[in-house]
């Protein structure tokens, strides 16, 4: 399977190489019909998708998927949707979710901007998660950073009033950029107050990558804003 795209725009990601394992390939045959959602299916009805009404969490760029599966298992009273463009990560996520019988998780293999525009109803999300997005640290590539004024306004429309937009990054310059964009964005409030970074919430797992960075003295910054208007 290949990632789904619809609208032409500046991409905040690069489709990286990397072969799928046999287990990941088999996961698409076995588990995609249950866990996968197509961009081209159009707007979702979360209650129909999950068979119940529950708090809804959307994660953009779940990587290899372990932390998202962990969150879904740890919070069975909420429903989770993940978006990822890299097939090996999607294959790993659905393989683990299927093997472990995780009922409250679905995913897209598509461009997040397309999914937000075409599939996620306004005012439907209790939380949107964006953990460790590509920092595009070269200045000439800064425009590719996903956190931009237009993007955060799109997120605000998808959140419920009081819903949270939670970002995390291990690049200090990107953390400062995120804070600058969010502080200037209308209709948001920083739950930590002012321009303060938030402590890591208990629901966000610490990844192996993050622990490695911490052992090397790297920082991690959490930014959490709620929709106020």
Swiss-Prot record:
Recorded catalytic activity of this chain's protein: guanosine(46) in tRNA + S-adenosyl-L-methionine = N(7)-methylguanosine(46) in tRNA + S-adenosyl-L-homocysteine
Binding annotation for S-adenosyl-L-methionine: 59, 84, 111, 134
Keyword field: Methyltransferase, S-adenosyl-L-methionine, Transferase, tRNA processing
InterPro entries xrefs: SAM-dependent_MTases_sf, tRNA_(Gua-N-7)_MeTrfase_Trmb, tRNA_methyltr_TrmB_bact
Region feature (Interaction with RNA): 140-145
One Gene Ontology molecular-function label: tRNA (guanine(46)-N7)-methyltransferase activity
Similarity comment text for this entry: Belongs to the class I-like SAM-binding methyltransferase superfamily. TrmB family.
Function comment: Catalyzes the formation of N(7)-methylguanine at position 46 (m7G46) in tRNA.
PANTHER family in the cross-refs: 3-DEOXY-D-MANNO-OCTULOSONIC-ACID TRANSFERASE/TRNA GUANINE-N 7 - -METHYLTRANSFERASE, PENTACOTRIPEPTIDE-REPEAT REGION OF PRORP DOMAIN-CONTAINING PROTEIN
Protein name, entry field: tRNA (guanine-N(7)-)-methyltransferase
The organism of origin for this protein: Saccharophagus degradans (strain 2-40 / ATCC 43961 / DSM 17024)
């Amino acid at each position: 399977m290949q990632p789904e795209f619809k609208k032409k725009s500046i991409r905040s990601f690069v489709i990286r190489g990397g072969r799928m394992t046999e287990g990941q390939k088999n996961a698409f045959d076995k588990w995609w019909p249950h866990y996968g959602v197509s961009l081209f299916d159009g707007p979702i009805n979360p209650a129909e998708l999950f068979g119940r009404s529950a708090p809804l969490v959307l994660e953009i760029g779940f990587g290899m998927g372990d932390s998202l599966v962990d969150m879904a298992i740890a919070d069975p009273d909420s429903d989770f949707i993940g978006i990822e463009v890299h097939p090996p990560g999607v294959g790993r996520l659905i393989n683990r979710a299927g093997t472990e019988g995780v009922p409250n998780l679905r995913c897209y293999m598509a461009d997040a901007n397309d999914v937000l525009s075409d599939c996620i109803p306004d005012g439907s999300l209790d939380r949107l998660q964006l953990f460790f997005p590509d920092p595009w640290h070269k200045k000439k590539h800064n425009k590719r950073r996903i956190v931009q004024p237009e993007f955060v306004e799109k997120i605000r429309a998808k959140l419920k009033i009081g819903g949270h937009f939670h970002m995390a990054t291990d690049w200090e310059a990107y953390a400062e950029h995120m804070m600058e964009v969010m502080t200037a964005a209308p209709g948001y409030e920083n739950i930590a107050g002012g321009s303060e970074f938030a402590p890591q919430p208990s629901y966000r797992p610490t990844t192996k990558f993050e622990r490695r960075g911490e052992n090397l003295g790297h920082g991690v910054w959490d930014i959490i804003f709620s929709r106020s208007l």
